[in-house]
C-alpha cells in the first residue's frame, strides 16, 4: 500500500513562487504593452469570429448539455451561448485558435499567447455578471488587458529558454500554467491558493505533440489551447475551495515534472517577468499561415506578381529554393501526403505553392476542395528548404527575433526570379507602423462576417477608441459581441 504524505509544509518551488508573486504584485506601467494588448484583443476576437464560418469548429462550441443556459453565464463572441466559466473558456479559446490566425511567440518554445484570452475573458465576464447582480461594479476592459499582458509574459518568458517540443510536449502546457495563475488572481484567490492552483497545473498530465506531426497531424491542434485555458479555469476553481497544492511539483525527485517530463533538466530564464512579451509579440496579419512560413508566403506573393508580369505560371517552374531557419525546417518542412487542413497549414511547401499558383493564401485554401488541385502537390515536390545558420542565429537573438525566409524560383527556360529575402513579417514589432492599420482592417472584416452593419458600427465605436474601450465594463463589451 502506498503512503500518502501531506506536503503543504514544504516551501514551493521558486519557479512557481515567481509566477505567483508576479501576478499578484507586479504593476504594469508600460503604455506600449497596454496599446499592444488592445490591438491583440481586437485581433484575437476577430480570429474567433472568423472561425465561426467553419462547421468543424462550431460543432465543438457551446454547452456540454445541448440547449443549456447558465444564469449569469459567460457569453461567447459571435454566438448567443450563456455558459459556465469552464465551458465558456473552452468555447472562446477553441474559436480563437481554430484557424491558426492569432498572435505568435517564437523562442526555444513557440506558441500563441493570446490563447489565454479564452480563460481570461470567460472569467472576467462570469465574475462581472455576478458582481453586477450583487450591486458591485463590473471589471473593466483595462483589467482584461492587464491579465492578458501577464499571461503573455508568463507563457513567453518560460518559452524563451525552455523547449517543450524537444521532449515531445505541446506548448499548450504554458497556456494552462499562465491562464491558471492569471484567472486565479482575477477570482481573488489568496497567495497560497494561487500557489496551489499553479502547482496543480504543473502536475496535470500534459498534452503531447502527437497531433501536430506526421503521421497524426490533426484538428486537435485547433482546440488544444481551448482545452488548456479551460482546464486552467477549472484548476483555479478547485484551488478556490481550499484544495491543497503540491509545493515541489517541478523539482520532486523521480515524481516531479522535471524528472518525469523534462529529462531531469530545470528551467532556465533569460529575464524576469515584466511586460516584454506583449511588447514584442508577433501578429498574423496578412496570411493564416504557421508563423515560420509568414515571410516565405510574403516572398511568394511578390514572386507571383513578377511571374504575371513575365507571362509565366506555376507550370513553368522547375525548382524553388527556400533559405530558412532551423525551426522552420524542424516544424513545417514536410514531404508526402497531407491529410487535412491542420496538416496543410503546417507545411511550408503547401503555403508557398498556393500563392505561386493562385496569388493568394486564405483559410479556405487549406480545405479539401482546394487541396485536390493537382498543381499544388506537383509544385510542393519542386520545393527545397535549406537552413541558413545566420537566419537561425537572428531568430534566437532577443534584439532581432527575425523569422527570415528567402525564396528563389527557377523556370524551365533557365531563367529565375529572386532571391527575395524577407527578415521580418508584417506582424513583427519592427513593422508595427505598417502592420497595425492592416490589423484593424482584418478586425473589421471579421466583424462583418457575423454582425449587421449597424451592429458593426456600434462595436467599432466602442472597441476602436482606446480610451473608451479601456474604461468600458466587461459586460458592456461582451453584450455588444453577442449574436442577437
Regions found by a protein language model. Give the residues of each.
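Well-ordered alpha-helical scaffold segments within catalytic/enzyme domains
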Residues: 51, 120-130, 180-187, 235-239, ...
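Structural helix-adjacent loops and short alpha-helical linkers that scaffold large soluble proteins
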Residues: 127-145, 188-195, 244-248, 308, ...
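Well-ordered alpha-helical segments within folded domains of soluble proteins
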Residues: 114-122, 175-182, 229-234, 293-297, ...
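Aromatic-lined, polymer-binding surfaces characteristic
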Residues: 153-183, 225
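Long, well-ordered core segments of solenoidal/helical folds
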Residues: 150-159, 198-209
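Extended, well-ordered alpha-helical scaffold segments
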Residues: 12-15, 19, 63, 136-151, ...
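Hydrophobic alpha-helical hairpins/lids featuring a short glycine-rich hinge
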Residues: 96-158
